[in-house]
Amino acid sequence: MSQMEIKLTAKEILDKDFKQSMRGYNQDEVDKFLDTVIQDYEAFQKKIEQLERENELLKQDLKKQTERPQRSQTVTTPSAGSTNYDILQRLSNLEKKVFGSKMYE
């Protein structure tokens, strides 16, 4: 999306004085100024729409990123109790193989 340059600030709009001709304000000057204001509003609207889309994409990415670690942690992290039990079971099996039935006599 091409960047549209913003031509007016709020202060410039507030401080704008139109020169008066014999029948009131110079119509061409007022029309040009209003055209510039309209262009700025259009530029603001496009920028807002772009930022809203970008914001939505970032929210979706963040949601995906926060879901991934939770799933992997629950799958890969066994509880401490089951890990200790597995170690004790392996140790017991190893003792039986190394020492045989002598241990239990």
Curated annotation (Swiss-Prot):
GO biological process: cell division; regulation of cell shape
GO cellular component: cytoplasm
Subcellular location(s) per record: Cytoplasm
Cited InterPro entries: Cell_cycle_GpsB, DivIVA_domain, DivIVA_fam
Basic and acidic residues biased stretches: 61-70
Signal among keywords: no
The keyword Lyase is assigned to this record: no
Coiled-coil region: 33-71
Biased composition (Polar residues): 71-86
Gene3D superfamilies in alphabetical order: 6.10.250.660
Region listing for Disordered, in residue ranges: 61-86
Keywords: Cell cycle, Cell division, Cell shape, Coiled coil, Cytoplasm
A Pfam family matched in the record: DivIVA
Function statement: Divisome component that associates with the complex late in its assembly, after the Z-ring is formed, and is dependent on DivIC and PBP2B for its recruitment to the divisome. Together with EzrA, is a key component of the system that regulates PBP1 localization during cell cycle progression. Its main role could be the removal of PBP1 from the cell pole after pole maturation is completed. Also contributes to the recruitment of PBP1 to the division complex. Not essential for septum formation.
Family as reported in the entry's similarity comment: Belongs to the GpsB family.
Subunit structure and binding partners: Forms polymers through the coiled coil domains. Interacts with PBP1, MreC and EzrA.
PANTHER family: CELL CYCLE PROTEIN GPSB, CELL DIVISION PROTEIN DIVIVA
Name of this protein: Cell cycle protein GpsB
Organism for this UniProt entry: Shouchella clausii (strain KSM-K16) (Alkalihalobacillus clausii)
